[in-house]
Structures are given as structure tokens and as C-alpha cells.
Amino acid sequence: MNSLVATPPVPPHFYEYSRLSSPHPMSTPTHTPTNRKRKADDDGNDHDGRMSASPTNSPAFTPRSLPAPRSFKRSRPNVSGRPLSLPRLLETLDTDALRGILRSMCERHPALADEVIHTSPRPSVSSALQVLRNYQSTLQNSFPLGGNPESDYAYNRVRQPLGNLLDALSDFTPHFLPPHETQASVSLSYLDGATDIIHALPRWHSPQNNIERDSAYDEICKAWILVIREAAKRGGGIQLQYGGWDQKLAKHNQNAGGRLQAAVNELGNSLGWMHGPDSQGYGSSTGGDLVSVREQLLSGTYGLGTPVKVGPW
């Protein structure tokens, strides 16, 4: 007997699931394993790819602005010679050349000389003495090598530089004298340095060759007298009292062989009123004691070393 096996009925919810699902089934990718071994080239290529790839989270690089190109002077198409400008020309000149050019211009244009005089700064004592020392150095270098430096031959060899020094001394000295110079300290400082330069003048065997040296002493002595008189009129001669000029002038007179004695006497007369009625004793022991007392009184130190008596008088 043939029996038919009935197929079990399909539940109704199965049909509903089939109806809602997509008619195209999703296919999952399958990885087919290969038996090929990895090579070193593959690893290197993979590593280079990873290193060359920029990360997605790396910050963006902002481009930097390049510096502006320097501007250079454009070369002239036609090269030709031309004279220097005035500033460049003056840079090539030394001091002597500038003095010569300025002197020549002042000689051709007298009005320019007055402008130069009023525009130039006032010469100082140090600058004037330096000029005199330069003339003195030139004089010393002009002496002939060997032989007698006091002979007539040596005098003839150095006559020109000696005259230049004495002329410069005669020109500079009135500039530092009153009334043109109002500061007594400036005048005294210049005379002190100028007298030292006269002391260094050469001595000659022939008396007639020493006339110029003696004349220089006479002129500087008159300058000392003029400055001392003007300084004594101002502030009671305070500049003469505390500058030690009495000792300096006495030393100059000694080096000059007594040719500045008139200036020493003038200084003694100017300071005589501080020594009492006996002004002739200036420079003696009594005069020195009075000067010491005067200095102590004016400086406020008089009587500091005297013991003070305590108790009934």
C-alpha cells in the first residue's frame, strides 16, 4: 500500500518574512587564501606607501612669505668718467691739505675769512700748546747729526723752524691775554705752558744768536705782568693766592736766569696787602707764616689743632 507522506504546512509568518526581505540576497566577500609567500619587495613597497601618505589629522602647513628682493642700483648703460662729488673729495684730503685749501679761499675772498673766524670754535689752552709743541718737535728734528749743537752751523740749519716756533708763540700769546681772555685761570695756564717751551729753546755760543731767545723772555714777562694785574683786580686776587702761582713763577724765573724777576715783583706787590704793612718780607719765613695763617682762615681750618682750655679763666 502506497502511503503518501504529507508535506507539513509552512507557517504563515514565514511568508511574511520572505515578503519583507530584499529579493537580492547579500553576498559576503570570501577571502581566498593563497599559498604565495611574502617577499621583501612587498614589505618595502607597503612601508613606503604608508610613509608617503600624509595623515588625515596632520595640521595644514601655511606658506611662508619670502623676503622681498633687495633693490640694487641699476647699472648705467654708458660708463664714462666723472669727477668726485664734494663730500667724497673732502674725505680724501688730510688736515694739511684742508688747511691749505681753506687758507687759499680766504685769501681770494676776504669776506669768507671773517665768516671762518666767527664760525670756528675758540682755541683751547691744550690745543694751542699742542701746536707750539709740534713746532718745537720740528725744531729738534732739524738739528744736524753730530757736531756741536750750539755752533753757528747748527743755528743756520735750524733758523727756519726756530723762526716758525717764535712766530707761532707771538701769535698765540695775545689771544690768551686780557681783555680778549676774561678768565685769569685760562691766561695763567697758557703762560705756564708757553714759558716751559721758551725754557727749551736752544742756547748758542754766539750772543747775537741768543737775541731771539732773550726777546721771547721779555715778551712772556710782560704777559705775566699784565695777567697778574688783571687777576689781582678780581675777587681780591683769589686766583693768585690759591693757585700756587707764586711758587710756579719763582721756578720759572730761576730757569730763565732771572729774566722774569719783574713778574715776580709784580706778583709780590699784588699779594702784599695780605701780608700786612711789611710787604717787603714776601717770601721770607714771616711772610710764609702769614700766608699759612691766611690760608687756614679762608679754608676754615684755623685753630683746629689748638687745645681748648676748660675751667675758670
UniProtKB/Swiss-Prot annotation:
GO molecular function, one term: proteasome binding
One Gene Ontology biological process: nuclear protein quality control by the ubiquitin-proteasome system
Annotated organism of origin: Neosartorya fischeri (strain ATCC 1020 / DSM 3700 / CBS 544.65 / FGSC A1164 / JCM 1740 / NRRL 181 / WB 181) (Aspergillus fischerianus)
Alphabetized InterPro entries for the sequence: Cut8/Sts1_fam, Cut8/Sts1_sf
Compositionally biased residues, Low complexity: 21-33
Key words, A-Z: Cytoplasm, Nucleus, Protein transport, Transport
Keyword Transport assigned: yes
Subcellular location: Cytoplasm; Nucleus
Name of the gene encoding the protein in the UniProt record: sts1
Bias (Basic and acidic residues): 39-50
Protein name: Tethering factor for nuclear proteasome sts1
Oligomeric and partner information: Binds the proteasome.
Region (Disordered): 16-84
Presence of the UniProt keyword Lyase in the record: no
Role summary: Involved in ubiquitin-mediated protein degradation. Regulatory factor in the ubiquitin/proteasome pathway that controls the turnover of proteasome substrates. Targets proteasomes to the nucleus and facilitates the degradation of nuclear proteins.
Family: Belongs to the cut8/STS1 family.
Superkingdom of origin organism: Eukaryota
Entry's Gene Ontology cellular component terms: cytoplasm; nuclear membrane
Pfam families (alphabetical): Cut8 (PF08559)
